[in-house]
Amino acid sequence: MTSLDYVHAASIADAVALLNVPTLRCRPIAGGTDLVVAMRQRGPWFDRLVDVAAIPELCEIEETPAEIRIGAAVTFARAAASPLLREVAPLLVQACLSVGSPQIRNAGTLGGNVINAAPCADSLPPLVALDATAHLAGPEGERTLPVSQLAVSPHHATLRPGELLTHFTFARMPRGTRSTFIKLGRRNAQSISRLSVAAAGRTGGAGVVDFVRLAPGAALPHTDRMLQVEALLLGQTPSPDLFRAAGELAARLMIDITGRRWSTEYKEIAIQGLVEQALAAVFGADPS
């Protein structure tokens, strides 16, 4: 049986130091819901686990004058129960409530879900739709990048050696914005997303769309906003026909990027329907 060094970090600086011992291959752990499964499947590929779950800065949800801040070790359950997130990011709360089982939501963290970079990760579409920024700390200092540029391909995050994801930030969306997260899985509970959509938007005084964001999950090699679909919607009056056109465009864009494969016939129809439903929920119109 492989022996592992397991240490607890008391601060971000402590964690970075513990992760950067030249003679050891180190890995951070918080909830472990993905990492422990991977260890059981393939065996550990590191010598040391650095537990960061108790670092105060990684567990906070707060609002500053400029932005919302969510620590990377915040669990799905804590995020879902946050009054602040229920107010400013209901699409993220919906996504957190859809994750796995209560046991997984109580242990799994937003940061771990993003760093694992699974295309089906439930937190990625809402964070991308929120235009969230990821904050990282490492031996060379701190840096930031959009969440959409952190998880760039299936199970590959653009972390530099010895870096730690510390928190996410995003600005409040414009007043009057509504949002939603819709997930399609094999069953209602403990389901891995086959497809999902996070959407946010509002209409202005003239009754036309003046703000919209749309990010599908498990549809593309990595989660990103569909800017062409957003452009189609901006300046238009919400209607079932508009939502249908947006859904059709989303399906075409998905196929253009991924090509046709055995699952395309199903996903083409499914992503179109999810986009229509999400836009109807955001803009308050019946998609049928």
Predicted regions and their residues:
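C-terminal structural segment of proteins
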Residues: 1-288
